[in-house]
Every structure is written in C-alpha cells, then in structure tokens.
C-alpha cells in the first residue's frame, strides 16, 4: 500500500511568485501586525494530502485477468458439454436447466473479463466498457437469482414437473438481471485507458441504484435464504430453502457487495474515515473483493461439477436401468 496519487509540481512561474511573496512578507515583517486565521483541523480526508492505496489490479494484473478468462471459458464449456451431450440422462439432475444457465452465465462473465482488464491501453472505448460492465454484472445478477430460485423451488424446476415454469423463470430472471445492469451501464466508461465506473455528482443517482442492487442481490439474498432456512427449521414448518454446495457461489460475491456499499457511503460522505489508514484499507478491500468476484468464473463450473457428482451418486441407485441394460444384466446373471 502507499500513496499513489501524486501532487502536481509547481511551475517556474508559480515558484518565482511564491518566492517574491515570501521576500515581501519578510521585508515588511517589522511594520505589519499579523492576524492568524482560525484553522479548521477537522477538514475532511479529501482536503488533505492524497490518502489512497495503490491499485492492486493495475497493468501488472493483466496476466491474472487473461488466465482467469481462459480457464473460466474452458471450465464452463466443459460443463455445458456434459449437460448437453446426447447420452446425458436428464433425470439425474432434475434442475439441469438451472445448472446450464449458471454455466452460461459463468462463460459470459469469462468472455468479458479481458474487455475490462487493465493494461490494454487505447483499445478501451466508452461503448465497449459500458457493454463489458453490462455483461459483467448482468451475468452475476442472473446467476445469483438462479441460485435463489433453485434453492426455493428445488426439484420442481425439473423438466415436466411444472409446465412452463422453467421457461418463465428463465425469461424473468435474465430480464430482471438486464434491468439491474442499466445503472452501471450508464455510469461507466473509459478513463485514462481504463474501464471504470464514473463517479460524479450528475451520476450519483445511478451509482446509488447500482449499489443498492448489489447489496440486495449479493448480500441480502443469501442472508434471506439462510434466515428462511433457520426460521422454518426452528418453527418446524418444513425443510425450507434447499441448501447445497451451489450456495458456495455467494462466497465470491458477498464481499464485493459489502465493500461496494461501504465505498459508496464514504464517497457520499455519509461515512467519514478519520485516518488515512482506514481509506487505504478500504481501497485494498475493494481490490481484493473484485479479484475474488472475478475468480468465481473459474470456481462456478467446479461447483457445478461437484453438485452434479453428488446428485448422480444419490439418484443413480434409485433410477431404473434402460431396457437393454437390464436384459444384458439378466443374461449375465443366468450364466453365472
């Protein structure tokens, strides 16, 4: 960490002017009575020397972005191939449409990671950056909402369970996710060759809306699922939301939602940081939370594969074998 914002150097004209002013004040020091103005020692942090931590996700982090993108695309493609291969038995995973959409969301995120990566210089444009943030957060919002529906509806999402339910949820979830990305899409662009959200007074309403959306989807949604699970279990009202390994997805986005909310409070001066160390710590947490969120595109396919393995191990013994397999096993049994 350190101070990465450098103060502007004085121009020669400014230095000469300052020197003349100092000499005039020195020569007249015996004839003038000075009155010292009151000094406001409680000025806010931004009025003091720059007090921000170095950005961890700068140009040097470009290999991290590229490697994560490649691994995420390969892993998501593998999961999609498994789910859509011709011999796949759909009854092994009643909620396979949700799993497929989670893999698609992870793949979309992986594709746009290089677009928002630093170090690409002049290749960034405002339109491309806005599109990147739209897909970046849209895929994440959709995945979170899909996980919430999967936990709440469980096996009712299987094919043939409730006609039209899966299609309706798919259209609704991705539509809501697209609407939630409008604020960050409109409040982002290219600045200094980097894709970044634009913080300005004119866009404060959009920034607030985006922050609220992140808090609701990444923070409050998993907390609500956990709360409903515990409440139903305590009151004996049934099992509650279906808890499984897929909930591990929120580990990668929950910190991002929390730190983004804190950063908005600080920028809005609703939360004042009293020391430089606190501001530097917040900057560091922002970078770490963003890096953790980026890693979800690699972890999500692995989580899906583990969930599929658990589902097949649980349901396979109870499923009837195909007709050809059963006759073949009967033949082997008679020979023995």
From Swiss-Prot:
Q: Which GO terms describe its biological process?
A: chemokine-mediated signaling pathway; inflammatory response; regulation of chemokine production
Q: Which Gene3D superfamilies match?
A: Rhodopsin 7-helix transmembrane proteins
* Main localization of the protein described in the UniProt heading: other
Pull the Cytoplasmic topological domain ranges from the record: 85-95, 154-166, 229-244, 309-336
TM stretches of this protein = 64-84, 96-116, 130-153, 167-187, 208-228, 245-265, 288-308
User: Membrane topology per the record?
Assistant: Multi-pass membrane protein
Q: Which regions of this chain are Extracellular-facing, per the record's topological domains? A: 1-63, 117-129, 188-207, 266-287
What UniProt keywords are attached to this protein's entry?
Disulfide bond, Endosome, G-protein coupled receptor, Glycoprotein, Membrane, Receptor, Transducer, Transmembrane, Transmembrane helix
- List the InterPro entries hit by this protein, alphabetically: Duffy_chemokine_rcpt (IPR005384)
**Which residues bear sugar attachments?**
16, 27, 33
**Molecular function terms from GO:** C-C chemokine binding; G protein-coupled receptor activity
Task: Give the CC-aspect GO terms.
Answer: early endosome; membrane; recycling endosome
Location comes to: Early endosome; Recycling endosome; Membrane
Is the Lipid biosynthesis keyword given for this protein?
no
SUPFAM superfamilies on file: Family A G protein-coupled receptor-like
S-S bonds: 51-276, 129-195
Q: Which family does it belong to?
A: Belongs to the G-protein coupled receptor 1 family. Atypical chemokine receptor subfamily.
> What's this chain's function?
Atypical chemokine receptor that controls chemokine levels and localization via high-affinity chemokine binding that is uncoupled from classic ligand-driven signal transduction cascades, resulting instead in chemokine sequestration, degradation, or transcytosis. Also known as interceptor (internalizing receptor) or chemokine-scavenging receptor or chemokine decoy receptor. Has a promiscuous chemokine-binding profile, interacting with inflammatory chemokines of both the CXC and the CC subfamilies but not with homeostatic chemokines.
- Per its record, how is this protein called by name? Atypical chemokine receptor 1
